[in-house]
Amino acid sequence: MNSEELYNKYSTNLKQKYGEKVYKIPINLPTTCPNRDGTCGVGGCIFCGTEGAGFELLSNKYSIKKQLDKNIGYIGKRYGAKKFIAYFQNFTNTYMPIEDFKQYIREVIHPSVVEIAISTRPDCIHEEYLEALQDLENETGLRMSIELGLQTINYHTLSKINRGHGLAEFLDAVLRIKKYGFEICTHLILNLPWDNQRDVIENAKV
C-alpha cells in the first residue's frame, strides 16, 4: 500500500505474494446452494443471479479444462498476465459430494495456475473438505485459499437479503479454516440499503 492509498488493494497483495500480475480465472461448476434447494432457504440471496455470482463466467457445459484454457488465453492476452488463480466462484463450492470436489480441484492443476480459490458459504465449512484441500496443497504445492460470503455483520440486513446465516456462522467458519492455515478472503457489500455507516465500520473491524 502506498502512502496515498487508504486501503491495501487486492491486486497489490497478489503482486507482493507472487512477484507479478496475477488474475483470477472463474470456473463454472454444475453445483447449487443450500439457500436455493430448500436446505436452509429457497430463491437464493437477493443479489445472486441464476448462474450464481460471477464474472468472465463461461458455461458449465464446457469442461473445466476448456474453461481454464479459454480464459487463460483471453485474460492472459488482454491483461498480459502469466500467472493465474483458478477460482471456484459460482454458488457454494463445498456443497457437493466430497469426491466430486476433489476431482474438480485436480482438473484445474495447470502450469500457469499458482493458487486455487474456493468460494463458499460460512455455514458450509466442513472438516472433510478442509482436510481434502490440505492434502491437495501438500501434494501439489499449490496455495489453497477460501472465500467466504459474509456481505454484512448486520443480522437484520442478512435476513433482508435472504442469506440464511448470521455472523456466528461466519466466525465459526473462520476459526475452522484458520486451523489449516488457509488464507481467507471475506466478501462484503458496502452500503446495503438497510446498513448504516456504523455497520460498515463494524464490517471492517470483524
Regions flagged by a language model, labelled:
Residues 1-64, 70-85:
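N-terminal [4Fe-4S]-dependent radical SAM core
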Residues 45, 107-113, 202-206:
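Structural recognition of alpha->loop->beta junctions
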Residues 51-71, 75-98, 113-126, 142-170:
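Core AdoMet radical
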Residues 65-72, 101-106, 130-134, 171-174, ...:
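Generic structural signal for well-ordered alpha-helices
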Residues 75-79, 105-111, 131-143, 175-179:
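Acidic (Asp/Glu)-rich catalytic clusters
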Residues 110-116, 183-186:
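Short, surface-exposed connector motifs at secondary-structure boundaries
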Residues 133, 193-206:
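Catalytic cores of alpha/beta
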Residues 149, 155, 180-198:
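Conserved strand-turn element in the central/C-terminal portion of the radical SAM core barrel
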